[in-house]
Amino acid sequence: MILPLFPETQVHVFVYENVSNCAAIHEQLISQNPIYDYAFLDAATILYKKQVYSAIIRALEDRRDEQMKTKTIHSEVILSLSPKTEISSAFRQFSMTKKSKNIVVVKIDSKLTEEEEFERLDKLVEGNRVEFSDEELQKLIDFKVLKKNYKLDPSTLENPLASILSSIALRGYS
């Protein structure tokens, strides 16, 4: 996919459910294996496609403006999801863990087509790929975790998208 604000940047997003090898993937991420150069997100923390796209755009804007706080564009996506400025907190709240069961995988600056990228990921992730859609994400969400991560109160739970997007956009500006 090409984002209108960044036409030179290829972006792919995939969703997997019932992933059985998150612990092995996590170990590869810790060892910085370049084959795993993706943003691996815990799907329990993602409610909307716009949430992911907003984090991607925020990360790309920070890279363009030379304002990245992390070492890679993929870790910047994870930080961009967070309403907090602490990198370690963002990773604890939004990154895939050893115990994750469902994940969202983001690839930025891919030289491969979406299908080629999927084939590559299919060798790394042992799980079922599902459509990247609000409907599928909402099946995988953990509202307790979402409320905690974004400090959502009962008044915002009816339509949390505005609060989530505001948190992403305003991180570091308060």
From Swiss-Prot:
Coiled-coil ranges per UniProt: none
One GO CC term on file: nucleus
Annotated localization: Nucleus; Chromosome, Telomere
InterPro entries from the UniProt entry: CGI121/TPRKB, CGI121/TPRKB_sf
UniProtKB keywords: Activator, Chromosome, Nucleus, Telomere, Transcription, Transcription regulation, tRNA processing
Cystine pairs: none
Signal peptide as annotated in the record: none
BP-aspect Gene Ontology terms: tRNA threonylcarbamoyladenosine modification
Role, per record: Component of the EKC/KEOPS complex that is required for the formation of a threonylcarbamoyl group on adenosine at position 37 (t(6)A37) in tRNAs that read codons beginning with adenine. The complex is probably involved in the transfer of the threonylcarbamoyl moiety of threonylcarbamoyl-AMP (TC-AMP) to the N6 group of A37. Cgi121 acts as an allosteric effector that regulates the t(6)A activity of the complex. The EKC/KEOPS complex also promotes both telomere uncapping and telomere elongation. The complex is required for efficient recruitment of transcriptional coactivators.
Family: Belongs to the CGI121/TPRKB family.
Oligomer and partners: Component of the EKC/KEOPS complex composed of at least of SPAP27G11.07c/BUD32, cgi121, gon7, pgp2 and SPAC4H3.13/PCC1; the whole complex dimerizes.
Protein name as annotated: EKC/KEOPS complex subunit cgi121
Species of origin: Schizosaccharomyces pombe (strain 972 / ATCC 24843) (Fission yeast)
